[in-house]
């Protein structure tokens, strides 16, 4: 289990580095601290392949990269929450969480708090389930593409209905 946790922390840094974030020296030092703590240099760490990077790469081709990134970040916050009582790595985890605040949440603690709030909603609570189903239509509406909701406006001049001549249409030119 310890090796898995270390690999997860390393993957977090790699995910952020690949997505264009600049890893400062202190962040790298903290990740090195986690690697030492979890003995991630052991040969069995790589068994079974990568944990999330293969999945993340598959989403690089789509424009919906933020969706998978938010799931990966959610995963790491759950991991960090599970490790919060470990005094030996508490400072390292705090540094990494601060870096996430800057790079993923655009330095907005309010966005991070909202993210954490949604992440911690208990899905097995019947009252939560009722509220979630009640709000589902509104959520689906907000997720729908905005472009399909708008009607295109057509310029009257292009179809002969306007008073202005259209320089691209020979029929609209006056003699």
From Swiss-Prot:
Transmembrane helix found in the keyword field: no
GO molecular function: cytokine activity; type II interferon receptor binding
Intrachain disulfide bonds: none
UniProt note on tissues of expression: Released primarily from activated T lymphocytes.
Leader sequence residues: 1-23
Sites of Pyrrolidone carboxylic acid modification: 24
GO cellular component: extracellular space
Cellular localisation: Secreted
GO biological process: adaptive immune response; defense response to virus; humoral immune response
Keywords of this entry: Antiviral defense, Cytokine, Glycoprotein, Growth regulation, Pyrrolidone carboxylic acid, Secreted, Signal
Positions annotated with a glycan in the UniProt record: 39, 106
InterPro entries: 4_helix_cytokine-like_core (IPR009079), Interferon_gamma (IPR002069)
Subunit text: Homodimer. Interacts with IFNGR1 (via extracellular domain); this interaction promotes IFNGR1 dimerization.
Function: Type II interferon produced by immune cells such as T-cells and NK cells that plays crucial roles in antimicrobial, antiviral, and antitumor responses by activating effector immune cells and enhancing antigen presentation. Primarily signals through the JAK-STAT pathway after interaction with its receptor IFNGR1 to affect gene regulation. Upon IFNG binding, IFNGR1 intracellular domain opens out to allow association of downstream signaling components JAK2, JAK1 and STAT1, leading to STAT1 activation, nuclear translocation and transcription of IFNG-regulated genes.
Family indicated by similarity: Belongs to the type II (or gamma) interferon family.
Protein name listed in UniProt: Interferon gamma
Taxonomic source organism: Peromyscus maniculatus
